[in-house]
Amino acid sequence: MRLFLARGREKSLLRRHPWIFSGAVQRLEGNASAGETIDILDSQGKWLARAAYSPESQIVARVWTFQQDEVIDSEFFVRRLQQAQSWRDWLAQRDGLNGYRLIAGESDGLPGITIDRFQNFLVLQLLSAGAEHQRAALVSALQQCYPECSIYDRSDVSVRKKEGLELTQGTVWGEMPPALLPITEHGMKLLVDIQHGHKTGFYLDQRDSRLAARNYADGRRVLNCFSYTGAFAVAALMGNCQQVISVDTSQSVLDIAKQNVELNQLDLSKAEFIRDDVFQLLRNYRAQGEKFDMIIMDPPKFVENKSQLASACRGYKDINMLAIQLLRPGGILLSFSCSGLMPTDLFQKILADAALDAGHDIQFIEQFRQAADHPVIATYPEGLYLKGFACRIM
């Protein structure tokens, strides 16, 4: 099948952006079902790209290749995997990793595909019709490149519904992952729940931020909000914090957080785990006059679509205002947003407004983004989704 773009709508493809939106389509020639590979042409019939067809999505096609002679088959996926692996090998050596993002979707030339490696388990998320259509070719390539690895599917994410796909989960090849699998980063051991954890089991993207937290933690009383399985708490303890309190609404993840502290043979008496709503707990702490020297604010995604951006801004401002009010002068706030729809400059403005409402001046002393195994290809700036700031309270 061939998809012709409306006149003038080829500009983004000429700049090698990997998405084609439904509004850019002039006409379709031939028949193709969801996920099949189609050719993209401009209004004059000039070939531009080869892409996966997603008729039920606003993103009607996602580009596999801009090379006309490149066939989308198992060997294509082998080449992409080898390109990605060479960078991860260097990172793993530098940072002491046996867990990392192997494929970061569009930024690794594989739109709609996420692959995380935890020891000898490869965890897949296939997020688009094209990715699902190529499942067999991708799995074949993974078996060829990683014969020592088991493959587990965590395509149980709601974004698949936008592509007309069912949610899937389970072992694809090899062994079932254990209930908890330890990985290492920067000398820390951290447990991963591949089967039931958030995303593919762990937030690999915050690795650099955890190292920063460790470097700031010395002698500080730390509040770790939205703690999940306590990786920031382990980092703070390894950085010789005075105390770290981890807060989450899930008791099961707090139990793993405690296990992570024990796994690293750290002082459990310096760690506290509280099951509570972060917003409410911060208000309670303010009323009680509690004070901290460092607060880590790493909430879940507040923005799923553009219509939620205004309410998300209010949520980010409120929670960061409360955090700033709980920090002593000289205290450090590490605050993050993991939503791609939240621009970095807007998030920085929200933090500035939160400080104003809190009645404090803050200094921006460091800026964060997702770790380097989550690269952002220059032609797809949307790949930058995680942003954060270290702020010092004056």
Curated annotation (Swiss-Prot):
Residue ranges occupied by any PUA domain in the UniProt entry: 1-79
Gene3D superfamilies: PUA domain (2.30.130.10), RNA methyltransferase domain (HRMD) like (3.30.750.80), Vaccinia Virus protein VP39 (3.40.50.150)
Compartments where found: Cytoplasm
Parts forming coiled coils: none
Reactions the enzyme catalyzes: cytidine(1962) in 23S rRNA + S-adenosyl-L-methionine = 5-methylcytidine(1962) in 23S rRNA + S-adenosyl-L-homocysteine + H(+)
Enzyme class (EC, first level): transferase
Keyword Flavoprotein: no
Annotated family: Belongs to the methyltransferase superfamily. RlmI family.
Functional note: Specifically methylates the cytosine at position 1962 (m5C1962) of 23S rRNA.
Official protein name in the record: Ribosomal RNA large subunit methyltransferase I
Organism the protein comes from: Yersinia enterocolitica serotype O:8 / biotype 1B (strain NCTC 13174 / 8081)
Gene name for this UniProt entry: rlmI
